[in-house]
Structure formats: structure tokens, C-alpha cells
Amino acid sequence: MMRLGLVVGYSGSRIELPMDLVKAADEMGYYALWTSEAYGSDAVTPLAWMGAQTQHIKLGTAIMQMPGRSPAMTAMTAMTLDQLSGGRFLLGLGLSGPQVAEGWHGVAYGKPLGKTREYVEICRKIFKREEALVHEGEHYGVPYRGEDATGLGKPLKSILHSRPDIPIYLASIGPKNVTLTAEIADGWLPFIFSPRHYDSVYKTQIDEGFAKAGGGKGIHNFDIAPSISVIIDDDLENAYNRVKPLLALYIGGMGAKDKNFYN
């Protein structure tokens, strides 16, 4: 089943939300609003603002940057917004890239597959509240036990009672990341996605992830939520020209000259 969403994205030098469009999408039965972030406006605050002025539409991040937040901070934010919105939040996560992780957030980009798996695992533990949080992994350790630890940290359980199954979506591009997404996430946020090439490019990777997940997971209970640019214009050439700058930014100008994950 196909559902429609509205991508609000992130701001330029000033944040201006298209509230007329947002309210219309809510009234017309659109499935979700999606926000994003780079190194300016964040993805969550606009959703809180829009969520307070809508009733039905789901509120998704596409994406919240994992390097910018600890897993616990992300889980706290997700639980808070989900409860305030009446269970409408969709947690979309992504690693961004080395340029933003290291150049903006000041943390190592590291090993994306391992970090993503642990990050999602910690978030789900916090949502479920089955026990106090303990995680001992290669990339994250909770409670912190490093050489500079005080030794006073102890396992904690969220005070806020959350919906235990807040949906988690992952943005992924590389084959191994796509497989990981199908294995551990509830949905996938692909970029520059062409449905006609799904079988030849992505199907094997997605099916491999489903097989690793087990439990009857498959395309029937997994969301694929690509974003596309829609331009309404009687002049086809003019419509093309309005789309080209965004594509050029990601394909040719995003990241470093010798390392761009989008091309």
C-alpha cells in the first residue's frame, strides 16, 4: 500500500515552516511529515511545533543525526515527542557523513555498521523499560566505565513510560547498510530511489536483512519511505531545472571530493 507524506526538510538562514501545507496535509489524510537536519536547524523542534498544530499526521525525522546525540538522548527525545503527540512519532536515524560528524559534532565517524546496530539496540532497550539500561559494546558503554569514569554511574531505567515499539527508520545507501536496515529497523529512508531498479539493485540486500531478522519479517511489514521532489509546472524543462540544483548538491557537492556517499 502506498501512503503519501510531506517532506519539510531543514531550513536555510531562517526557519520558516509551510504551515498552510502542513495543515492541509493533515486534513487530507497524508501519512507523515518528515523533517531533517544538517548543520543549522535541528529536525526535532520543528516537529514539536507542527505536532501541536496538527491532529492525525505522523511526525517523522528523516533524519536525526546519530553522531550528534547519544543513544539515550535520542531515545528521551523520541519518547517525549511521541507521548506529547499521542503516539505519532517516527524515529528516523542516520549517520550523516564524516564531514558533519567530525567537522560539526566533533566526534569520530568510525565504523558505521557497528555503531548503527548498537545505537538502535540501546534505543529499543530504553523504549521497552524491561530493565535498567546496561550496554557493553565496541562503540557504546552504558554505564560509562572508561579510565576517566568516576565509578558512580549506575544502570538507570527511563522515568518516562514509553510506547515500547516506537518505529525506527534508518537512512542507508551502501549495500551492507541497506541489509542492516532491513534486519534491525522498521523502515528504510532511501535517497535518490528509483522503484524500477528495486529488484536489480536493492532486493537481494533487503531480503538478506529480512532473513537475518527472522520472525516472519518481510516486505509486507517493512516500510520503504523514499523522498522525491514534486514540481508542478506546465513547462517540463523548467521543472527539470528546478530539481537539478538539489540533485547537483548531493551528487556533486556533498562531502569531500574523493569521498561522497551519494555518488
Please describe what each predicted stretch is:
Residues M1-G9, G60, P98-A101, Y140-D165, ...:
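N-terminal small/glycine-rich loop or linker at the start of catalytic domains
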Residues M1-T61, P67, I166:
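N-terminal beta1-alpha1-beta2 module of alpha/beta enzyme domains
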Residues L4-V8, L33-T35, L59-A62, F89-L93, ...:
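Hydrophobic faces of well-ordered beta-strands that scaffold small-molecule active sites
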Residues S13-A24, T77, S172-L180:
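Short, acidic/polar
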Residues G29, M50, L81, C123, ...:
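Conserved, mostly hydrophobic/aromatic
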Residues S41-A48, S194-G209:
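Active-site-adjacent beta->alpha loops and helix N-cap segments on the catalytic face
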Residues P67-T80, G110:
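Glycine-rich anion/phosphate-binding loops
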Residues G110-S158, D199-N263:
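An alpha-helical appendage that flanks or caps ligand/catalytic pockets
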